[in-house]
Amino acid sequence: MIKEGLFPDNMSLRLAILSRGPRLYSTKRLLQEAREREIDVSIINPMTLSLFSAGDSLDVTSEGDSFEWDAVIPRIGHSITKHGCSVLRHLDQLGVWCANSAEGIQQSRDKLQASQILSQNKIPIPKTVYVRDPRDVERAIEYCGGLPVVVKVTQGTQGDGVFLRYSFQETKNLVQGLLLSKKAVLIQEYISESHGTDIRALVVGDRVVASMRRRARGREFRSNYHLNGTVEKFEIPSEYEEVACRAALHIAGVDLLEGEDGPLVLEVNSSPGLEGIEKASGVNVAGEIIDYVINEATFSEVSMDQILRTIPGEGVLSIQVRQHPKLIGNPIQSLFEGLEKLPTYALSRNNEFIWNADGETLLRFDDLVICYGDLKKLRTQLKLAIFKPVSETIEEQKQD
């Protein structure tokens, strides 16, 4: 049943599961759990949706009828990522709640972009090199800690396009072949401690609801369930749970390797299969997902970046303190001394986001300062603060 107070008596949540596979285990389980909670639910093939755009209106139709669902759970297959994400963007603009965003799905499915975002947020990953020229293979192998190495294409799923190579020549030949076939190639550190095994953490919202260990069979090093790997229940340590939640989307399967120094994120799956993890863990994962949708579908996340860009002359600027060493040790308010009033700003530090931090807070090497206001005035003032002569800065610090 729908939890009391979430929806008025005369209003029922209308839920669409976007999937081309109505007979797949995961799709059927989500449908079953939604119906048990008396939700008006349907499975919609995203390929049947048409998108209408005009200067003042948007619309979506499903097999000729208007799309009239309040929320969607996207189960977008890898081969239709582009179309599926276009659908999600359209629905989002129409106010339809989406369990995962188009941006999140696209980023998670591009292994290069995913590694960049994870690294930017200081989430541990295996050392990774994006290679465009076979002449860089030797240097990439050295960067990754030597042989063997894992070679991957940036677009792949369920272990497809992932290879383990033990020699330089084998690696170079493989990379050359992939590049000739117009594939984007990654060379990645091989984590020997996790050979043939990984941990799948199923994240829903801000918590891990289930986890399992996957093991490859025989000489296979890829542990994917779809490659006939075995699964077993796994009690996830708090350190691994924290990393998984930081890496995940709203609903995601996060694959973790057990490195010598702790967990490493291997991949984030925006449309995780439920069969293996439900069987291994004994957890009703589909039910957890449906309950999450019921609780969250009343609220829609807003992209502030898009909204702020609609105000003429105003926008957001950011400063990486590490790029401007003279700022280190100065109070954050010194960035805005020439402005009539302090702008709205935030400080990103140690994975925390602090809105309007105390102006006396001293800037550190790894800080990121984000500010919003009149772009022309902000740029002028920030340039003055960044490029202020060192002699003036020292004199001011002496006076303080």
Label the predicted regions:
Residues 124-146:
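Rossmann-like NAD(P)H-binding beta-loop-alpha module
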Residues 20-127:
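Conserved N-proximal alpha/beta basic substrate-recognition cap immediately N-terminal to
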Residues 118-119, 141-160, 183-194:
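ATP-grasp fold ATP-binding core
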Residues 91-93, 360-361, 378-400:
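Short, compositionally biased
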